[in-house]
């Protein structure tokens, strides 16, 4: 879960695809 937050800072919400790829 913490990793998701870190990625949210690096990638804007527009890149929500990145979050799904990691998860």
Curated annotation (Swiss-Prot):
One of its GO terms (biological process) is positive regulation of peptide hormone secretion. Keywords: Amidation, Cytoplasmic vesicle, Secreted. The keyword Secreted applies. InterPro entries: Bombesin (IPR000874). One of its GO terms (cellular component) is cell body. The modification Methionine amide is found at residue 23. It is found in: Secreted; Cytoplasmic vesicle, Secretory vesicle lumen. Pfam families: Bombesin. It comes from the Eukaryota. Belongs to the bombesin/neuromedin-B/ranatensin family. Stimulates the release of gastrin and other gastrointestinal hormones. This is Gastrin-releasing peptide. The gene is grp.
């Amino acid at each position: 879960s913490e990793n998701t937050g870190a990625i949210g800072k690096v990638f804007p919400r527009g890149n929500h695809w990145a979050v799904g790829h990691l998860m």
